[in-house]
Design a protein with these regions (language model features):
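Extended Gly/Ser/Thr-rich low-complexity repeat segments
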Residues: 141-150, 286-291
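Ligand-binding beta-strand-loop-alpha-helix segment within the catalytic cores
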Residues: 138
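N-terminal, positively charged, Ser/Thr/Ala/Gly-biased leader segments
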Residues: 1-22, 132, 144, 149-170
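A glycine-rich beta-to-alpha transition motif near the start of alpha/beta enzyme domains, typified by
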Residues: 1-126, 177-292
Length: 292
């Protein structure tokens, strides 16, 4: 099976072109190849498949084999792969207020519906950055889902490891719990991350993010991803943190997230209420995985 290793600011996945390759046990394969000692090493597996409703379809499997609805860093890499390998004909330009016009776009089917991505292409016809319309954030507790009351979950207290933390919950394709703090480096993420992910208030488990706001235009974040653990970056999580920062009057709607793997440009657009995520997509290497 041929594969391509790609990363978006350090959030790395193994990508398989299912126009040419067949994957029968994706969940099991994701667990094996994601192992950083005995496999290829990644945060998970992403399949690029034909779609009846969009240009292509992407399926995401976490390192533990569970299937995710969406991955903001992953979809950017899918867009780069599809364009550069000519798996689909690009559509027209994508224009987002306050950002450069993307000259070409693609529609990608995800577990969260069809998303439009704009391509920022260099003179060598290579995709350098991708702007993703992540859609409108979901704030209703039952739709995130979280077992908390109210129209929105904004800085509500929850008990974690014998203490109390204030959380703001958002779905940007998958569920996120955001916690603001003074210093993200002081958070024992290895300890508190799994406790939040598997908390009884989150029926589908949840991604946990700790955010240190620097000023109204930028914040630092660290992530514990559902099914993958600590990662260098989380694109959909960055979008959720942007929304949470706006809802709590900490940041502007256009801001930059600083993550361990790099930066993401975020825009919770007032006109259409959609969140736009812009960041790089990088091909690391190609390889062949043995049949057995």
């Amino acid at each position: 099976m041929r594969f391509t290793k790609m990363q978006g600011i350090g959030n790395d996945y193994v990508y398989v072109n299912c126009f040419e390759e067949k994957v029968e046990t994706a969940a099991k394969l994701a667990q094996i190849i994601s192992d950083r000692h005995f496999g290829i090493g990644s945060d998970g597996l992403i399949l690029i498949e034909p779609s009846r409703t969009a240009d292509v379809r992407m399926r995401i499997f976490n390192a533990d084999g569970s299937e995710a609805e969406m991955c903001g860093n992953g979809i950017r890499c899918v867009a780069k792969y599809v364009y550069e390998h000519k798996l689909a004909t690009p559509r027209g330009s994508l224009s987002v207020p306050g950002q450069p016009i993307c000259p070409a776009s693609l529609n990608i089917e995800t577990g969260n519906g069809i998303l439009t991505v704009g391509l920022i292409i260099d003179e060598g016809d290579k995709v350098q950055k991708v702007c993703v319309n992540m859609g409108q954030p979901i704030l209703t507790p039952k739709d995130i889902p979280v077992k908390l009351v109210g129209e929105k979950v904004i800085e509500q207290p929850i008990e974690i490891l014998g203490g109390e933390l204030l959380t703001t919950c958002v779905s940007t394709g998958n569920p996120h719990a955001v916690f603001f703090c003074d210093d993200v480096e002081e958070i024992e993420l290895e300890k508190i991350g799994p406790a939040i992910e598997n908390h009884k208030l989150f029926p589908n488990r949840i991604n946990a993010h700790f955010v240190q706001v620097e000023n109204p235009k930028e914040f630092i974040m660290r992530s514990w991803e559902r099914g993958s653990g600590i990662t260098l970056a989380c694109g959909s999580g960055g979008c959720a943190c942007c929304v949470a920062a706006v809802l709590t009057n900490r940041c502007n709607r256009i801001c930059t997230a600083h993550l361990a793997g790099g930066d993401l440009d975020l825009n919770w657009n007032r006109q259409d209420n959609c969140v736009y995520l812009t960041g790089p997509a990088v091909e690391v290497f190609n390889g062949t995985w043995p049949e057995n």
